[in-house]
């Protein structure tokens, strides 16, 4: 049995990555591709790399076009999902790759996004640890009909730090995260600061001083994992790589814990995870190791002089950071094998 799929916003980077991954999925069948300004164009004009869809045509993005499918993936700009979702049947599985339904706290939404608060949906990070109820988020995704996919930066920081927060081996205050990110995370719209002539040979910090929209979502996740208040200073740095995130995060080592205790916490958290892997001691990931894959690689060290734990996490922002997480979560919701249709191996060189 196959499930019929519509991808809204299929002309963008996230939408295109959804199509690339879904092309090899044995149970999810893409029937409808929608776009805004690209409606009416053939897919090969926008995504020439997606040969299997080359002669398909984008249709306009309306609730009417999306209705009647078993699964609808939304890869739309922030603020565009709520109105469309309200018109879809509540038995349709809707997976939103935008930010509209990620935050639980309405005040945080108002402070960082603004506009109408659409409410939180079940969160699409299966590996997210839960301090109070125990277990992981995957048990809370089974059978749901609405899923909010995490922000890509949020996923990288959460996967890097949550084992230590959950085990209490790192302090939840004074966490610092600096992320090297590629421009595809900002979407496909033309912006001067994302031009090759501006990016190549350079690097630039942005949203400095806790102003990035992913900040409250990072806190939300780490507080879910740890059960208490968390403070995080998060700074993204735009670097000249098309895709990928390398997240370097540090936190104070909690009193009374050793390097052995720290490593044991990460090993326990990720021992059975299909897509999150702790690297051997002394090894740290490269972004190129995970390109094109749904895998997250985590390196771990102790800075003895500073008394801090250091994690380095690499993900592909378009796969594990967006489209892969969407499909992984949809698999769980539909009762399919969690890893179905998702690549574990990266592409090299």
Curated annotation (Swiss-Prot):
**In its keyword annotation, does this UniProt entry include Amino-acid biosynthesis?**
yes
One GO molecular function term of this record is: NADP+ binding
User: What is the enzyme's main class?
Assistant: oxidoreductase
Active site feature: 152
**Sorted alphabetically, which Gene3D superfamilies does this protein's record hold?**
Dihydrodipicolinate Reductase, domain 2, NAD(P)-binding Rossmann-like Domain
| GO annotation (BP), single | L-arginine biosynthetic process
tRNA-binding is among the record's keywords: no
Q: What is the catalytic activity of this protein? A: N-acetyl-L-glutamate 5-semialdehyde + phosphate + NADP(+) = N-acetyl-L-glutamyl 5-phosphate + NADPH + H(+)
- One GO CC annotation: cytoplasm
Q: Which Pfam families match?
A: Semialdhyde_dh (PF01118), Semialdhyde_dhC_1 (PF22698)
Q: Which InterPro entries match?
A: AGPR_AS, AGPR_type-1, NAD(P)-bd_dom_sf, NAGSA_dehydrogenase, Semialdehyde_DH_NAD-bd
**What pathway does the annotation place this protein in?**
Amino-acid biosynthesis; L-arginine biosynthesis; N(2)-acetyl-L-ornithine from L-glutamate: step 3/4
What does this protein do, in the record's words? Catalyzes the NADPH-dependent reduction of N-acetyl-5-glutamyl phosphate to yield N-acetyl-L-glutamate 5-semialdehyde.
What protein name applies here? N-acetyl-gamma-glutamyl-phosphate reductase
- Gene label: argC
């Amino acid at each position: 049995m196959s499930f019929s799929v519509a991808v809204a916003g299929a002309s963008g980077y996230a939408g295109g990555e959804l199509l690339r991954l879904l092309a090899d999925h044995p149970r999810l069948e893409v029937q409808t591709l929608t776009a805004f300004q690209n409606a009416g164009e053939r897919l090969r004009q926008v995504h020439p790399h997606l040969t299997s869809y080359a002669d398909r045509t984008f249709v306009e993005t309306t609730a009417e076009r999306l209705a009647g499918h078993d699964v609808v993936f939304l890869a739309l700009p922030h603020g565009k999902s709520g109105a469309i979702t309200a018109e879809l049947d509540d038995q349709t599985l809707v997976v939103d790759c935008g930010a509209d339904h990620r935050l639980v706290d309405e005040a945080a939404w108002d402070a960082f996004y603004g506009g109408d608060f659409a409410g939180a949906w079940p969160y699409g990070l299966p590996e997210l640890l839960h301090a109070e109820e125990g277990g992981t988020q995957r048990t809370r995704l089974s059978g749901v009909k609405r899923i909010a996919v995490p922000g890509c930066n949020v996923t990288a920081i959460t996967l890097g730090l949550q084992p230590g927060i959950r085990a209490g081996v790192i302090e939840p205050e004074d966490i610092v995260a600096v992320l090297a990110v590629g421009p595809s995370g900002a979407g496909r719209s033309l912006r001067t600061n994302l031009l090759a002539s501006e990016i190549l040979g350079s690097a630039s910090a942005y949203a400095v001083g806790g102003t990035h929209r992913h900040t409250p979502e990072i806190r939300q996740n780490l507080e879910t994992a740890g059960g208490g208040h968390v403070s995080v200073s998060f700074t993204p740095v735009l670097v000249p790589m098309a895709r990928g995130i390398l997240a370097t995060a540090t936190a104070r080592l909690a009193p009374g814990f050793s390097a052995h205790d720290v490593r044991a916490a990460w090993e326990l958290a990720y021992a059975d995870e299909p897509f999150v892997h702790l690297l051997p001691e002394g090894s740290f990931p490269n972004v190129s190791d995970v390109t094109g894959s749904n895998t997250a690689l985590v390196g771990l060290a102790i800075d003895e002089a500073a008394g801090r734990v250091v994690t380095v996490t690499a993900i592909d922002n378009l796969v594990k950071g967006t489209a892969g997480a969407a499909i992984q979560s949809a698999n769980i919701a539909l009762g399919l094998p969690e890893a179905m249709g998702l690549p574990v191996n990266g592409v090299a060189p």
